[in-house]
Amino acid sequence: MTGSTYDIGDCMVKYTYEGDSGTPHYVALNRSPVGDGESYCSRIDISAVEMTEKVNLQLLSNSGKVLDTFSTSVEDYSKSLLASNTKEYAAYKPVVKAMLNYGAASQQYFGFMTYALANRSLTNADKTIQQIPQATLKQYAANSCIRQFSMSGIHYYGSSLVVGDDVKLRHYFKLDSGRDISNYSFATYVGGDMIGYATPCRSKDKDMYYIEVTCTNRNFFSGMRTIVSNGNTETILDYQPMNYIAKAYGSSKLTSELKTLLDAMYWFEYQKIK
């Protein structure tokens, strides 16, 4: 969308999901960071299970007038990119295929729109999701940094992976009797850069608290660190999403749907940094 077509001004984008009669969503139209400087874009966050769901969009002027209307989906854009012979798109095709497989695995795991899987347009060969290499699982299963966590009054209890609009690591901590969680801080780092302080939340167990850290391709495989401090001393928890995946992979409770989801997640993240 270019400025020569419309007087962009303070335009907004209104969007709804096809078949959804709920409240519409609005996002700003911003100048695109790529291109000729006259292009504009809007960002709409789509979760992994929503890749085949149609999104209906309207470009609105600052007075509310509808300037343009169109419909698209992650699947639609992915198919056009995969079918393109443009040389610059070739490098993105492996990650797009991995993304569609991750979307399909997410749909099957959560039972969402399983009649329209994200990878349905791929060849049978491209739909095949390989297992996570055993050497990789073994590497992340042996995380000695977890066992080094040590601080008076607070104990690392375990971690889980929360899969939703974002993938988050949730770390659980248990307090000794009489201890107050407000006396501890939880600083999160990625690749040596401090991201901020995580706010502890009380879990269903009254003596248990957890913090959540959003995962990105920067910290999926390495570089994620939480430093817990009581004001006098510090202790470190080095734990990546792959540490949890390696543990879950070896669990007797692992279902085929979860295994496929973890495999697809691994290869999607792998392709993003390849």
Where does each model-flagged region fall?
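Short, surface-exposed linear motifs at loops/turns and structural transition points
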Residues: 1-274
